[in-house]
Amino acid sequence: MTGPHSNIVHVIGAGLAGSEAAWQVAKAGVPVMLHEMRPDRMTEAHRTDGLAELVCSNSFRSDDAANNAVGLLHAEMRRLGSLIMRAADANQVPAGGALAVDRDGFSAAVTKALNDHPLIEIARGEIAGLPPADWGNVIVATGPLTSAPLADAIRELTDENALAFFDAIAPIVHRESIDMSVAWFQSRYDKVGPGGNGADYINCPMTKEQYEGFVAALIAGEKTEFKEWETNTPYFDGCLPIEVMAERGPETLRHGPMKPVGLTNPHDPTTKAYAIVQLRQDNKLGTLYNIVGFQTKLKYGEQQRIFRTIPGLEKAEFARLGGLHRNTFLNSPKLLDGQLRLRAQPRLRFAGQMTGCEGYVESASVGLIAGLYAAADARGETLASPPATTALGSLLGHITGGHIETIEPGTRSFQPMNINFGLFPPLASAPTKKPDGTRLRGNEKTVAKKQAMSALALADLDRWIADHLRIAAAA
């Protein structure tokens, strides 16, 4: 590593946010020390020492930049030279309208890029407690599984209890163990996505009787017991365990991950399934499939017993069973400033899921902007924030000031959030007419509004890049 010691940016945690942050700092010509505690100290969810390991789904969700907020975030990150998006694009697997990746190939690509960069040094070992006082420019991206000593140190520094919720992991099945005389390949509404062909999911149909028996088994199944300190931790609604969804009502799953719409069983095309379980490709070879929406806290034996009652999965062999881990995040609007710095100690900047964003892409995007801010600090410059009209700017706004504490005071009023168009400022003038001059009606208005917001976001981001950002050539 070259460059003066005082200019080094320390990034703690090499998940998606930390990896992206380190990449952006180095790409701007500033040296980086990237700290990762694995494999010296593992977490309850990680299984490798690879950087940017995906511990939950392998999906980056929609890649549609014109109509979907997360697809727009993909596009913005690509414009900013995101390593995470580059690795995802290079390791994509078919997934209908979504961008899904081979998790091992993805992690390997990120690890290699960071290892090979001359301005990045990777230090393996835990940072126990706050970073040393002489580290003047630090990005803390330790994620939802932050080790206890560091979490305790942050809590003491801020005099604020970290918030927490549970995040559950879906099981992965070996493709060859799925009975394709019962199941079939099809994407919902035959939608074609990145690297896909419109038949990217494996579908397992259920009759009404099978569905009702399955729901009853989920509710009755033996669950993982909570530790005493975990009993009051809420779930994030975007990653609810399937048995918790089942407990909310007998029809909940049929209107959620098991909805039977947009699919036709080629084995029995005249019979409409009452519910359908979908599996999504999990690796590039197509040998592993994860059960979509089936994150769970059922005990391992119960998972195998209950999930093998699904038609087509009677002989399923599991590469990984579902699990549960505790996620922690900060009350960011109160604790962080507009550039993600800790108000109580501005040398510390936070990034990723612990800031209160939810999702792989969102975490990486906050790492991206944190890296740009830190690089500017190292050069003695101040970087203007991305426009609020962009996906990056709107997510940053939610984290650092988008929540009005006085409306709903209390320790749990700020909650994790996926990127969505509801975080964007309203359009000054929403479209009302089609290109041919006829009036937009019903859902057409919603579609046109999203497309207008996306177009404005990309135009404003391009102007911001040109006006405020020095994009160094990737090493």
From Swiss-Prot:
FAD binds at residues 13-18. GO terms for biological process: tRNA methylation; tRNA wobble uridine modification. SUPFAM superfamilies: FAD/NAD(P)-binding domain. Keywords: Cytoplasm, FAD, Flavoprotein, Methyltransferase, NAD, NADP, Transferase, tRNA processing. Its cofactor is FAD. Gene3D superfamilies: FAD/NAD(P)-binding domain. It is an enzyme of class 2 (transferase). GO terms for cellular component: cytosol. Its EC number is 2.1.1.74. GO terms for molecular function: flavin adenine dinucleotide binding; tRNA (uracil(54)-C5)-methyltransferase activity, 5,10-methylenetetrahydrofolate-dependent. It catalyses: uridine(54) in tRNA + (6R)-5,10-methylene-5,6,7,8-tetrahydrofolate + NADH + H(+) = 5-methyluridine(54) in tRNA + (6S)-5,6,7,8-tetrahydrofolate + NAD(+); uridine(54) in tRNA + (6R)-5,10-methylene-5,6,7,8-tetrahydrofolate + NADPH + H(+) = 5-methyluridine(54) in tRNA + (6S)-5,6,7,8-tetrahydrofolate + NADP(+). Catalyzes the folate-dependent formation of 5-methyl-uridine at position 54 (M-5-U54) in all tRNAs. HAMAP family: TrmFO. Belongs to the MnmG family. TrmFO subfamily. NCBIfam families: gid_trmFO (TIGR00137), PRK05335.1 (NF003739). This is Methylenetetrahydrofolate--tRNA-(uracil-5-)-methyltransferase TrmFO. The gene is trmFO.
